[in-house]
Regions:
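Long, charged all-alpha helical bundle/coiled-coil segments in cytosolic proteins
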Residues: 1-6
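A short, ordered amphipathic alpha-helix with a cationic face
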Residues: 7-15, 107, 129-130, 143-145
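Active-site-proximal, well-structured secondary-structure segments within enzyme catalytic domains
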Residues: 12, 16-18, 45-48, 55, ...
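Short, charged/polar, low-complexity loop and linker segments
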Residues: 24-27, 117-120, 226
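A conserved hydrophobic secondary-structure block that centers on an alpha-helix together
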Residues: 28-42, 122-155, 163-169
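Active-site-adjacent "gating/activation" loops or surface patches in catalytic cores
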Residues: 86-124, 211, 215-221
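Extended, charged alpha-helical coiled-coil/arm scaffolds that mediate oligomerization and mechanical coupling
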Residues: 7, 12-42, 46-53, 57
Length: 239
């Protein structure tokens, strides 16, 4: 092969050769035929499971029915949409329809409503997909090991700036540490808003109520309205 002649290349030519040889190795071309075929089969299995995983989510229709009172805070035109109003004081939200899910999470005043919808959304196709996910993780590890990597993390990050999983994790850890003060300040603002909902009469010490995963969109949206006069629902009309 050309690479075996160890050509004296420089600059872009050297970079092109190195990256081409790396990609060949990542594809398994340096392996004996039997092991290369095994990696190819593992990759096909992984791709098939990935497609099945996404299809399961796309095909799962998870309707969650609320009363109008439970959806207090939603813009009035939400209730008039034919796909939403499905009965006498019955309003059906499909959690796999992104605009419906986000609209409720951003605007519904009731934490119980937001929580119920979020859990349904986070559980889409769970019974089918959790076993698939475990299989996919196993296949990823097998592929990485067959190709000579310590882990899937190292395999995935090799062609990127980080080069390995440990460096990528350090970057994330450093990033988290760097933004922590700003994050803490913004979180406190959301907590103050939630405390007003928990203790509407005010008074008492600041208790820093927990901002759950079904809370942040709502309080962030309220903060935008109060501080910047940004109405997310009104903006949707332009997109």
């Amino acid at each position: 092969a050309f690479a075996d002649t160890k050509p004296q290349l420089e600059g872009e030519d050297r970079k092109l050769l190195n990256e081409t040889m790396r990609d060949y190795r990542r594809a398994g071309l340096a392996l004996p035929p039997a092991k290369r075929k095994e990696v190819e089969q593992l990759r096909k299995q992984l791709a098939k499971l990935g497609t099945e995983f996404g299809t399961n989510i796309a095909n799962t229709k998870e309707p969650v029915v609320f009363t109008k009172a439970e959806l207090d805070g939603m813009p009035e035109d939400f209730f008039t949409k034919p796909e939403i109003k499905t009965g006498d004081d019955a309003y059906t939200v499909l959690v796999n329809v992104t605009w419906q899910f986000v609209a409720v999470e951003e605007n519904a005043k009731s934490e119980a409503t937001r929580k119920r919808l979020y859990i349904a959304h986070d559980s889409l196709a769970k019974d089918k997909n959790v076993p698939l996910l475990n299989q996919m993780l196993t296949l990823r590890n097998k592929i990485a090991l067959r190709l000579g990597y310590k882990s899937w993390d190292d395999f995935q990050t090799e062609p990127r700036m980080a080069k390995n999983g440990a460096a990528a994790q350090k970057y994330i850890d450093d990033l988290v540490a760097g933004i922590e003060p700003k994050f803490a300040a913004e979180l406190t603002e959301l907590q103050k808003m939630k405390q007003l909902d928990v203790q509407p009469q005010g008074g008492g010490a600041f208790t820093a109520p927990r901002i759950n995963t079904w809370d942040w969109r709502y309080y962030q949206n309220q903060l935008k309205k109060q501080k910047f006069a940004v109405d997310t629902e009104a903006l949707r009309n332009f997109f």
